[in-house]
Amino acid sequence: MCGIVGYLGKKDAFPILIKGLRRLEYRGYDSAGVALINDNGDLNVFKTKGKVDNLVEYCSDKNVSGSIGIAHTRWATHGEPSAVNAHPHYSESRNLAIIHNGIIENYADLKVKLQAKGVTFRSETDTEVLVQLVEYVMERKELDLLTAVQVALYQVIGAYAIAIIDKRHPDQIIAARKQSPLVVGIGEDEFFLGSDASPIVEYTDKVVYLEDGNIAVLKRGEDLKVVSILGEEQELVVKKVDINLGQLEKGGFPHFMLKEIFEQPDCLTNCMRGRVNVDTDNVVLSAVIDFKQQLLQAKRFIIVACGTSWHAGLIGKQMIEQLCRIPVEVEYASEFRYRHPVITNEDVVIAISQSGETADTLAAVQLAKDNGAFIYGICNAIGSSIPRATDTGSYIHVGPEIGVASTKAFTGQVTVLTMLALALAKEKGTISNDDYMHIVKELHEIPAKIKEVLKLNDRIADLSRTFTYARNFLYLGRGFSYPVALEGALKLKEISYIHAEGYPAAEMKHGPIALIDSDMPVVVIATHNGMYEKVISNIQEVKARKGKVIAIVSEGDTTISKIADEVIALPDTIECLEPLLATIPLQLLAYHVAVCKGLNVDQPRNLAKSVTVE
């Protein structure tokens, strides 16, 4: 949620920190700040409410010199968005400054104890408690900074990724993580910190992903040192990051979201590369090959996810049940972890997360592991926490997704779930050879068909202007199209701030039909499938109540075009792959409605790209 950046080296830290914050803007934030130690040993902290641009403007006449610093973008959890509550926070003596991502659950108790010792607080945040606690421990027990951080964190309950600097030690940064991501970049005589690798890749491709309970010591002139909270030295695992800087730029598009929508043909080609072989009509997933026994012996699959990933899981459920004949449950990770679920060693739990850092999904994974389940991860961010916590899994390989509203990650997740279902079905013998080859060929053609759908962009932009007046939308679908309706409604809510609901089309008559009138646009996914005639009846019911119908139909459909107000035709494909095509016009519709309303498409209000707290 929040963004952490740090630098220690020989260069001017401020521009590196600001550029790093801009790389992390996609995560969502409401304030920003920076702390630097200059050559005179002064610790300068500057912070503002609002965007990084506000911070840059505020600092234009300030002393921002120094070759060591930390910076932060905050998304409020404790305390309202304000300059006072923004990070970095400094200690009472102003010797220490800290930035933090996460939630300290026992901060109130710690604060009361510190206040009883005479410590004065400036902000309403849980983070300030950390820096005051570190200083209190440091002074009362005459400890060095690293030991003081260890002692302080031992008293903390909750999740955190932190970076702390001390003006009395201008040659080091102490960083630590627990249940919140933190990455250290290793350069030539310099170190970098980031919530993810995006602020780092411009300077080095060598990174260390800190594990839970790790504390990193970044010290000028020395090698990186990582210890546990108890002081035990940890093995350094240095990895190479493969991110193209061009993936972090808009590339001529007005917004990242539109760029990422248009990247989907190439993204899905990358997702299938080396996995779908059209010459041999075969799908090969290394995870299925390496862990065939565990996957085939499973009596049940449980998919855990949040948000858009949960919608992908609903499609995966239908795919796996239909092709593999295995019962599948789809759970919100946030609910799953607290409802005392029955999990056994005969279960396979599939955890889906774009970032690989979603707090609730990570907790659900740990719960499932503790109960003996086999864990399969589906993620985009390589080296993130969920892939490291699972037994096996598949990356979706769609590249960094910067827009807060997920687009290419969703279709990548659905593609991986499709490949998983196909690979398992073939191993289990639950699919005929003809059906298997037919689906593989159709899957291989999906990127080209998405390119055809994207040619409708201008038309969708035009019709979007017609619906910016709407205060409510209804999205309807059946079968594989129902999760697409949910995803379409979510996209509209996220970036246009228009209330929207997704429903199974047949459920419309059980409540939502009471809302339909001439001011209610209704988006219906009505492609040729086994329930086509029934969906036509649902459209007739909407029209009878003067609702405005936007229909997503199969190419060549002449029936629905006679009754719908707007029709968007998709290339033909088989039913189980229709979500990969039908979701594209819904992404474009949401995007263009938001643009027509003049809204910030890439950074919608109150939303964060990576939800790393509960």
PLM feature spans:
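Generic C-terminus detector
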Residues: 548, 561-563, 573-614
